């Protein structure tokens, strides 16, 4: 049975939209990492630069390379010994390499290699996995899904040319990155087209504006977990291989049940 991977979010920033400042100290971050492991997480994604809604595109100028290193490396050093896969959410190859040297095995690049062209070479050198997220300034010359597919497949091809195997390249449709609500609805409805590329797909909707708008009511980020879980279920039905979430326990339980139901359906169809 194919297991949906649960990627737990560990933001070590003071300003992330959902949990900024909660895990800013190493001790707090380690405590949360242990909690997620107990809750069944498959991958812990450590991030040192905010991508909160409305955050400026010049975040790489606001948070220096040195500051990102100072936020991320002590946490990675403290948790990489645990029996769980560690990912680092960064668009800088220098941060990626420093973390990969410590034993990290996945890089989650919100700019899909577009910000730092050396990212693919670094990830390839260490035999790691990479997540490529659809991003941009929101201006596009073709419909959103078509533009997303062209952009992500172009970057995935560059990653493969750099030596990263096909099955180690994850595609993230970029919910929460510059898209209108209608464009995000279109992307969600057509997730199967991204799945059809045969790259593993990671869905990252957790607590985002899209979830708030889907609920059609004012809500704090922590009040959006059940609606996030609905997108997890929907994504699994569409064929995504992983989900990036804040509430690990809820989504782990849901994903286990969805995986069982999908496997049950598959077996019965192939018995008949």
Curated annotation (Swiss-Prot):
It is an enzyme of class 2 (transferase). One of its GO terms (molecular function) is metal ion binding. GO terms for cellular component: cytosol. Keywords: Folate biosynthesis, Magnesium, Metal-binding, Transferase. It catalyses: (7,8-dihydropterin-6-yl)methyl diphosphate + 4-aminobenzoate = 7,8-dihydropteroate + diphosphate. InterPro entries: DHP_synth-like, DHP_synth_dom, Dihydropteroate_synth-like_sf, Pterin-binding_dom. Pathway: Cofactor biosynthesis; tetrahydrofolate biosynthesis; 7,8-dihydrofolate from 2-amino-4-hydroxy-6-hydroxymethyl-7,8-dihydropteridine diphosphate and 4-aminobenzoate: step 1/2. Residues 1-256 form the Pterin-binding domain. Its cofactor is Mg(2+). It comes from the Bacteria. Its EC number is 2.5.1.15. One of its GO terms (biological process) is folic acid biosynthetic process. CDD domains: DHPS (cd00739). (7,8-dihydropterin-6-yl)methyl diphosphate binds at residues 51, 89, 108, 172, 208, 244-246. Mg(2+) binds at residue 11. Homodimer. Belongs to the DHPS family. PANTHER family: FOLATE SYNTHESIS PROTEINS (PTHR20941), FOLIC ACID SYNTHESIS PROTEIN FOL1 (PTHR20941:SF1). Catalyzes the condensation of para-aminobenzoate (pABA) with 6-hydroxymethyl-7,8-dihydropterin diphosphate (DHPt-PP) to form 7,8-dihydropteroate (H2Pte), the immediate precursor of folate derivatives. This is Dihydropteroate synthase. It comes from Staphylococcus epidermidis (strain ATCC 12228 / FDA PCI 1200).
């Amino acid at each position: 049975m194919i297991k949906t991977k649960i990627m737990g979010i560990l933001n070590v920033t003071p300003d992330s939209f959902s949990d900024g400042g909660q895990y800013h100290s190493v001790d707090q971050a380690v405590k949360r990492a242990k909690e997620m492991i107990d809750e069944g997480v498959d991958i812990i994604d450590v991030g040192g630069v905010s991508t909160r809604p409305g955050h400026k595109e010049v975040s790489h100028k606001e948070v220096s390379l040195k500051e990102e290193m100072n936020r991320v490396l002590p946490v990675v050093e403290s948790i990489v010994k645990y029996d769980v896969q560690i990912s680092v959410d960064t668009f800088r190859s220098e941060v990626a390499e420093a973390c990969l040297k410590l034993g990290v095995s996945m890089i989650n690049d919100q700019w899909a290699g577009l910000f730092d062209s050396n990212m693919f070479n670094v990830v390839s050198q260490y035999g790691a996995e990479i997540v490529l997220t659809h991003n941009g300034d929101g201006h596009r010359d073709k419909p959103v899904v078509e533009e997303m597919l062209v952009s992500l497949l172009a970057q995935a091809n560059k990653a493969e040319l750099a030596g990263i195997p096909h099955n180690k390249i994850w595609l993230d449709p970029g919910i929460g990155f510059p898209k209108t609500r209608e464009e995000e609805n279109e992307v969600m409805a057509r997730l199967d087209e991204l799945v059809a590329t045969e790259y593993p797909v990671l869905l990252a909707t957790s607590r985002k504006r899209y979830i708030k708008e889907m609920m059609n009511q004012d809500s704090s980020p922590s009040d959006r977990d059940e609606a996030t879980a609905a997108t997890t279920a929907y994504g699994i039905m569409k064929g995504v291989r992983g989900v990036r979430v804040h509430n690990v326990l809820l989504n782990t339980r849901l994903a286990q049940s969805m995986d069982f139901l999908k496997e049950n359906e598959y077996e019965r169809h192939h018995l008949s």
